[in-house]
Amino acid sequence: MEKRILTDVERIERNERIARAYYAAYDKKAVKDGATYADWVYASHATYWSPYFGNGMIDLETNPISVEDSATMEALSYSIEFKDWGPIDFECYPSVNGVAWKTHFGAHRKSDDVFMDFFAYSYVHTNEYGEITHWETHVNSDYNDFLDVAIGEHGPYRESADDYMRAVMTKSPTTGSAGGLISALPG
């Protein structure tokens, strides 16, 4: 199928759907609300980067990261220590060239009902076809305290995101793929 250059309006709408699909994955409304990940299409040589998770570029063409799979693995792991983990608030800002969003996550600890929260920020750049060319994620410092409770350790994971995903998968009651994140970073 031949690619078609999208109009500015189509690009903005698609970029908003990209952000809302991310939110739906974490809010577990994907099926109920009819959200899909069809708009999460990576361009050739697309990259992912986060200073917290490895601080290196991941080639998304050869190591695609599934938002749905990653959200599932984190939710399973985090729910062992937290009874109601998920997004509290979500804001997205679509534009012609991409979308930025802020997600406020939080939960009550099962052990003592203390509420813990953190913020995550994502930036996705897209091309004229609406394909993702670059995606990055940032978290605030409260994420460290949250992870200490949720998985027993925190980053930043400077060498590789593998250590984070191993901790998540070790804590998880199930095993499985983390959507290509493990071993995706050089190191």
Per-range role (PLM):
Residues 1-187:
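C-terminal and inter-domain tail/linker signature
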